[in-house]
């Protein structure tokens, strides 16, 4: 919840870096985009993106919004030039001719599974149909059910992966297919809860939400369900449920932005339009298969084999076999505003780190204090949209499950020295090639499958 976070303290600008206003048109456009996405009113052309609240996922939003203003650059350009002044020098105001053109029409046909989708089917879940992500929105104004239905019809037509199906062949292999059209009537439900009391409203919504979650079917479809809860004079609720095979955290941001724009246009009586498509999930899948056989990815193999050889497990009291869903418990911890400010702003400035560096240092120290062994092996997740591995690929407005999962081995030789520990963890994480996306490609897409299928506890 970004609204509950402290506003970035722009007094943390580096010494000697005063506020410098944008002067050129491209600088002004970029400042406006950064202000909107980061929710900061005043941004100068020398403010560092990552020190005022930016991160790798937000950078994808920046790229997408800039494209709508006909300003073109890649996520890697933000990392290489993290100020508006620097970025304006590498950005282009017209799109280069791409070797691989984004498909603007309906996409259909088989799609190679991405590494994270291979991982999903490898789990052999008892109920693979119920592995969903969802969001429940409370409307500020009454929602027009007819316009809402039209909006989602358009979104499902535009974002192709929402029309996917999966089937398992006799060999055990799962096949992913993009349908050219969807039975839109099966996506949409309206519940009239106007007569339900305030006391019972939440339980009624929860019950229907559970049924909607259980109704998804990756083989028969659909992968998406939308429900409008009409609550009389009380604010309506909108529930969107999508199977994880078709969506990730970045995808939700794209979907919300498109839904808001389309619904508002329909409400105003205008013909809705969506931004041009970026490369399809299908194009990404085929490109990853080709990349998996390349010399570049095979050069990463010694690194990942060394990581696998270094992995160690946490000590356990009992050997109960594989962990199941019923073994999972959640522990919630909250930080004060002062602690949050230190974590997000003060410490990163002092050590030139990102939040992952600090959190993983703290975790390694905590586990080490418990086990008296200051080494830790764990899996990390990334957004997986490392499009720089594929020339001319743009995924900034593509919906799908792109997440990367990869093992990391952390080791502290001098845990008493906090500064040295932070530096050690930081350097270990910086050595990971292409932010870890190569591990899954080698493990699942390479023809000779050179990496093991061992998992961490």
Walk through the language-model features, giving the residues of each.
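Regions immediately C-terminal to embedded phosphopantetheine-bearing carrier domains
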Residues: 1, 10-125, 146, 150, ...
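Structured, non-catalytic alpha/beta "coupling" segments that mediate domain-domain communication
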Residues: 1-6, 161-163, 303
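Hydrophobic (often cysteine-bearing) scaffold residues that line and stabilize catalytic clefts
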Residues: 22-30, 59, 144-145, 201-205, ...
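Acyl activation and transfer enzymes in specialized metabolism, enriched
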Residues: 27, 72, 140-163, 240-257, ...
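Amphipathic alpha-helical segments in well-ordered regions
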Residues: 33, 37, 61, 86, ...
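Flexible, P/S/T/G-rich "lid" or insertion loops adjacent to the active sites of thioester-utilizing
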Residues: 35, 39, 117, 121-132, ...
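Acyl-group handoff/entry surfaces in thioester-processing enzymes
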Residues: 65-67, 105-181, 187-189, 196-291, ...
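His-Asp-centered acyl/peptidyl-transfer active-site segments
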Residues: 106-109, 124-132, 160-164, 184, ...
């Amino acid at each position: 919840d970004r609204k509950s976070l402290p506003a970035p303290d722009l007094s943390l600008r580096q010494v000697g870096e005063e506020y410098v206003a944008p002067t050129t048109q491209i600088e002004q456009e970029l400042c406006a985009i950064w202000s909107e996405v980061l929710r900061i009113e005043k941004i100068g052309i020398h403010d560092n993106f990552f020190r005022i609240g930016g991160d790798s996922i937000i950078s994808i939003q920046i790229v997408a919004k800039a494209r709508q203003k006909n300003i073109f650059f890649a996520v890697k350009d933000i990392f290489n030039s993290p100020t508006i002044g620097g970025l304006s020098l590498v950005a282009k105001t017209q799109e280069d001719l791409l070797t691989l053109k984004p498909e603007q029409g309906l996409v259909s046909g088989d799609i190679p599974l991405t590494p994270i989708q291979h991982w999903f089917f490898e789990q052999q879940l008892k109920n693979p149909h119920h592995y969903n992500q969802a969001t429940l929105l409370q409307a500020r104004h009454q929602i027009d059910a007819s316009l809402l239905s039209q909006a989602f019809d358009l979104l499902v037509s535009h974002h192709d992966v929402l029309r996917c199906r999966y089937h398992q062949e006799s060999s055990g292999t799962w096949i992913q297919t993009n349908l050219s059209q969807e039975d839109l009537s099966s996506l949409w439900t309206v519940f009239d809860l106007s007569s339900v009391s305030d006391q019972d409203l939440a339980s009624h919504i929860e019950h229907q939400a559970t049924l909607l979650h259980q109704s998804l079917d990756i083989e028969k479809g659909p992968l998406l369900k939308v429900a409008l809860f009409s609550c009389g004079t009380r604010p309506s609720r909108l529930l969107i449920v999508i199977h994880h095979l078709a969506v990730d955290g970045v995808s939700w941001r794209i979907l919300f932005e498109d839904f808001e724009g389309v619904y508002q246009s329909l409400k105003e009586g205008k013909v809705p339009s969506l931004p041009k498509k970026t490369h399809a999930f299908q194009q990404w899948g085929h490109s990853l298969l080709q990349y998996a056989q390349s010399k570049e990815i095979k050069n990463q193999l010694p690194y990942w084999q060394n990581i696998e050889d270094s992995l160690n497990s946490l000590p356990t009291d009992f050997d109960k076999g594989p962990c199941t869903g019923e073994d999972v418990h959640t522990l919630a911890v909250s930080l004060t505003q002062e602690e949050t400010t230190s974590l997000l702003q003060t410490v990163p400035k002092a050590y030139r780190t990102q939040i992952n560096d600090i959190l993983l240092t703290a975790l390694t120290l905590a586990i080490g204090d418990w086990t008296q062994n200051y080494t830790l092996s764990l899996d990390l997740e990334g957004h997986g949209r490392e499009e720089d591995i594929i020339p001319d690929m743009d995924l900034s407005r593509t919906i799908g499950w792109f997440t990367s999962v990869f093992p990391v081995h952390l080791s502290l030789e001098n845990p008493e020295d906090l500064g040295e520990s932070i530096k050690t963890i930081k350097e270990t994480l910086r050595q990971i090639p292409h932010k870890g996306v190569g591990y899954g490609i080698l493990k699942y897409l390479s023809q000779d499958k050179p990496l093991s299928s061992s998992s961490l506890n």
